[in-house]
């Protein structure tokens, strides 16, 4: 097994050079020169200009189609459907080694010219999906398949919501003041816990599942709760867990579920609608969801903060958001079943971890952050749960940046080290 990043010794230098960059142009040039980011997408803005940069430029194995055709092993062919972007080549033949481009920074890696990037004057973004829609108005295509799909598959619900949020912000139609991405507005947007599956499918789903003459009293009550729900996962939202349990149980193939299939020319609005023929399957999923909630001991209209929480140091912190698969933009996704005490975020969850919103006022930097899981895993530490509780209260921490801000911090102290 060969790891392209096992031969990548440039990543720390890349980060150091980025920290010293004086402009967005310099930042972009550094990324192209180093091509060292091991696995993540990059988004960046600079000071004094309406420009935003997206790149999936890093250390990526160079396995073009002809190499895959000639060198993929029988095991690789058998696994291709499950792992389409993982090349499994015959390592016993030198002809099957990864290729090197003229502009490859590292032997065996894809050259910079064949890696996705985009510079825009409106916005860029990535919500853990492929590079294809870094901007909904400017799809990226023509890059090696190892970078992911490009227009051949529906985008995740969270990706669709993220782009929708950006476009609504620029249009000034999202309910926040103006149409600019100010720090204050962005800090509210990313925590507002919108649920895209509910925004797009709740009404037609309820029209199908709540009209059965044989609906139980519990189903009728759940329908009433969801009709009144505001399609958000805030701590006070009532009934969101019923929707989560329902939507996660919908296992109908896309061709039988959606009224309008995915269209790469309209990726944010497709697939959409629900087919009447899916009603029976949806009713079964809804009934099972209602039963699961009732068996859990949580009320159908329980506030989300009662169901989704973190319990540290004897204090329970109500949380918000949910899972990407359900279409939450704000991710706090518990792996704990609702029937085992609720959606606890204290086991092996996934979701928001380190968050930052940064703007560049004249002559300075303003950064607001969260470390959602807190700084320490020691229950005796004062920092075992403080950041988590602040996150639950949506109280961003303004971090000091300038020297005067650092020395003015109440926790500032100096330590002199000598040999």
Regions found by a protein language model. Name each.
Residues 1-203, 211, 215-419:
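C-terminal/peripheral segments of proteins
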């Amino acid at each position: 097994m060969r790891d392209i990043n096992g031969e990548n010794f440039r990543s720390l230098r890349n980060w150091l050079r980025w920290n010293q960059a004086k402009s967005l142009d310099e930042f972009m040039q550094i990324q192209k020169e180093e091509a060292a980011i091991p696995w993540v997408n990059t988004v960046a803005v600079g000071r004094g200009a309406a420009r935003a940069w997206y790149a999936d430029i890093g250390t990526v194995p160079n396995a073009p189609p002809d190499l895959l055709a000639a060198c993929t092993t029988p095991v690789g062919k058998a696994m291709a459907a499950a792992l389409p972007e993982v090349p499994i080549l015959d390592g016993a033949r030198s002809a099957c080694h990864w290729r090197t481009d003229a502009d490859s920074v590292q032997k065996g890696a894809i050259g910079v010219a064949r890696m996705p990037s985009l510079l825009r004057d409106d916005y860029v973004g990535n919500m853990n999906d492929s590079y294809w829609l870094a901007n909904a108005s400017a799809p990226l295509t023509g890059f090696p398949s190892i970078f992911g799909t490009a227009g051949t598959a529906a985008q995740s619900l969270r990706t669709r919501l993220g782009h929708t949020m950006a476009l609504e912000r620029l249009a000034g139609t999202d309910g926040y003041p103006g149409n600019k991405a100010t720090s204050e507005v962005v800090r509210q947007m990313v925590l507002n816990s919108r649920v895209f599956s509910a925004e797009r499918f709740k009404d037609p789903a309820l029209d199908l599942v709540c009209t059965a003459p044989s609906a139980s009293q519990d189903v009728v009550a759940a329908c009433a709760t969801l009709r009144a729900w505001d399609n958000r996962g805030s701590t006070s939202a009532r009934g969101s867990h019923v929707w989560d349990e329902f939507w996660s149980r919908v296992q109908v193939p896309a061709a039988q579920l959606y009224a309008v299939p995915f269209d790469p020319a309209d990726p944010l609005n497709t697939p959409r609608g629900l087919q009447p023929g899916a009603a029976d399957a949806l009713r079964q999923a809804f009934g099972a969801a209602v039963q699961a909630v009732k068996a859990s001991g949580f009320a159908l209209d329980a506030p989300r903060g009662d169901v989704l929480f973190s319990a540290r140091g004897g204090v329970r912190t109500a949380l918000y958001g949910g899972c990407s698969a359900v279409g939450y933009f704000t991710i706090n996704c518990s792996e704990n079943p609702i029937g085992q005490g609720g959606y606890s975020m204290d086991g092996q969850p996934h979701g928001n971890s380190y968050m930052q919103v940064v703007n560049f006022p004249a002559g300075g930097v303003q950064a607001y952050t969260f470390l959602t899981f807190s700084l320490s895993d020691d229950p005796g530490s004062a920092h075992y749960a403080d950041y988590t509780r602040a996150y639950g209260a949506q109280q961003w921490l303004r971090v000091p940046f300038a020297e005067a801000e650092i020395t003015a911090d109440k926790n500032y102290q100096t330590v002199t080290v000598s040999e």
